[in-house]
Structures are given as C-alpha cells and as structure tokens.
Amino acid sequence: MSKKGRVLVAMSGGIDSSVAAVMLHEQGYEVIGMTMKTWDYANLGGSKKETGCCSLDSINDARNIAVSLGFPHYIVDIREEFGDYVINHFNKEYLDGRTPNPCVLCNTHIKWDSLLRRADKMDCDFIATGHYAQVRSENNRFVISKGLDENKDQSYALWGISQQSLSRTMFPLGHLHKTDIRAMAAERGFMDLVNKSESYEICFVPDNDYRGFLKRRNPGLEEEVRGGEFVMEDGTVVGKHEGYPFYTIGQRKGLGITLGYPVFVTEIQKENNRVVLGREEGLNRNGMWVDQLIMSKYENLKGIQKQSITKVRYNDDGTSSTIEQVGDEMRVLFHEHVKAIAPGQAAVFYEGNDVIGGGWIKSSFKQD
C-alpha cells in the first residue's frame, strides 16, 4: 500500500470524478475506482440515452481512465437500494404534496454508505468524489465548506453526510475552478472528457418529466387525482386541475388557467386535492421550520440564536437569517422575504463558506 494510503474514488465517467482520480493517483495515493450503477433507463421508462448517468458509455469512460493509469476499477450494482430508498422516497414525497430533492438523499444514504462499505472491504483509508466542496477538521468536528468555484459549489447537496463519513472523505477538486479541471484533462490527453456534455437532470428522470415519471410509477394515479380544485387564497374556486402531485410551490407555467394576471402555486393541499393560487407576492415567506437536522460545524445549536445565510434550494444565493434549534428542529427567521419555500426541499445553513448544518423543510410561515 502507498505511504499516503489507499483511496476508493467514486467515478461516474464524467470529467470531475475522473480528474479527481487522476489527481490522487499523481499525488501518490493507491487509487481504486468504483462506478455505482444506481438504475437503468429502460426499467423506469425514461429516455434511453447511451451517454447519460449509469449508461454503458459512462461506465466504460470511467474504466478507460483507470486502465490508462493502471489502477483497478470496479462496477457496483446498487439499483435495488437506490430504488428502495431514493426513488421510492421521491415518489412518496410528491404523493404527499411535497417537492423532493433526491440528490441529497442519494449522497447521504446511498453513495457515501455504499462507498464506505466497499472501502472497508478493500482496506481503503479514504473515499473521494469529484464534488466541488471542501472538508476540514476543526474543534473535533469535520466541517464541510464551499468549493472555491462558487459557480460549481456543491456543498448544498452534501450537508447530510455524517461526521463519521466525513472523517474519511476527500474532495480533491474543492480548491480548483472548473476551468482548471478542463485544462488538467486536456493536458493529459483526455479530450473525450473535455468535450463530454454535462447533465444537470435528476438521473432517473432524464427527460425532466417528473409528471410522466409519477404516472408510470403509479398506474391509475391520474384518474384518482384529476379534477381537484384550483382555489385562490381566499378560497374562491377558479378552475379544475390535473391532480395535486403534478404541481410544485412557485409554479407558474403549465397551470392551464387564465385569470388575466400571472398566478403562481402558493400551497398544495393533499388532504382535499386542492392547489392554492395567488399573485407573486403570495409566495413570500419570512420563516420556516426545518427537521431531520444533521449538523456539520457545530454539534447542535439548542438554545442558541445564530446568524446564518440560509439556502432553500440548490441554485439559491442564500438569505440572511437568524436560526435557533428548538428540540430536534430548526426555527429560521429570514431578514427579508423569501419566495417559493417548498416543503420537502433541503435547507442548508452557512456561516461564511462553512456549512453549519442542514435539514428538510417541514413548513414555512409569514409573520409581521
């Protein structure tokens, strides 16, 4: 074994994870590559793209990098556990009138757990991924912080990783920009990686048609929920909709209703199959409750009011807020209005570039 240690690298076949593996190999680590097959397009009725996540082409791309550098590469089939946890949860959340974030679930409960189990079997000291984030040890805690490249930062999707997992995690790309990664790949002759398009879709909904996914996943759902009422915030019925699972908070397009002015989905009421509509200002909230907390920088914040920049979705710049842990939940008071807070999405709290912790949005509120 290398003096620096043995590291198991998650390799998707994309440029980021491939360059992460290359960097660690060149730094003298004993690298083992692992590609996780999480699902397949045909069984789930999605697009049958040959170059997407988990495709044969992507698996071969990862293997070719390993072969060219002389380190072993393994393929691990985790479709069953991915389906049982991530896909079933995604489906259930929409049926509960919430808006899920499967990537956070996958990172926390599937990728890291799978990597660490295999790492232990292979006597690996560390695991590594191609995420744009950083991790460090401070005050007996392992702290996640933003990647140097703000445009590519992925810390929002990593808040759910446990302290034990973080203690063995490496993010080789955290201190680099995407332009650096492309340059490194080009310098080493990996032009296929440089020219490879990136995917920003949910991997098991590759056509981005979550409505179609739900219909395929739940035969008879469409008939069961069709015909519910669109109502205004004062309860006035203004039309019929296709079923509450097919709408999300903040949605404006695809409502199929014309009122003479723009309206948005402000609330989803599963219990009576109602979708509440309102003007844009009706999306404004200045507080929320977050549950299922996992803390990074601090063990807990019980009884402590702390200033934070809080993100309520992936592409959110964040909003200044005061957070206070109450029992097992976080009460968040924003210093200005935030639009379209969707229950089921992840909320992540930042102190500077550091992740304080995160959880799942339970509910939002508006107070004077």
Curated annotation (Swiss-Prot):
The record marks H131, Q345 as: Interaction with tRNA. GO terms for cellular component: cytoplasm. GO terms for molecular function: ATP binding; tRNA binding; tRNA-uridine 2-sulfurtransferase activity. The active site is at C106 (nucleophile), C203 (cysteine persulfide intermediate). It comes from the Bacteria. ATP binds at A10, M11, S12, G13, G14, I15, D16, S17, M36, G130. Keywords: ATP-binding, Cytoplasm, Disulfide bond, Nucleotide-binding, RNA-binding, Transferase, tRNA processing, tRNA-binding. One of its GO terms (biological process) is tRNA wobble position uridine thiolation. InterPro entries: MnmA-like (IPR004506), MnmA-like_C (IPR046885), MnmA-like_central (IPR046884), MnmA-like_central_sf (IPR023382), Rossmann-like_a/b/a_fold (IPR014729). Residues 152-154, 313-314 are annotated as: Interaction with tRNA. Disulfide bonds join C106-C203. It is found in: Cytoplasm. It holds the Pfam family tRNA_Me_trans_M. Its EC number is 2.8.1.13. It catalyses: S-sulfanyl-L-cysteinyl-[protein] + uridine(34) in tRNA + AH2 + ATP = 2-thiouridine(34) in tRNA + L-cysteinyl-[protein] + A + AMP + diphosphate + H(+). SUPFAM superfamilies: Adenine nucleotide alpha hydrolases-like (SSF52402). NCBIfam families: PRK00143.1 (NF001138), trmU (TIGR00420). Catalyzes the 2-thiolation of uridine at the wobble position (U34) of tRNA, leading to the formation of s(2)U34. Belongs to the MnmA/TRMU family. This is tRNA-specific 2-thiouridylase MnmA. It comes from Cytophaga hutchinsonii (strain ATCC 33406 / DSM 1761 / CIP 103989 / NBRC 15051 / NCIMB 9469 / D465). The lineage of its organism: Bacteria, Pseudomonadati, Bacteroidota, Cytophagia, Cytophagales. The gene is mnmA.
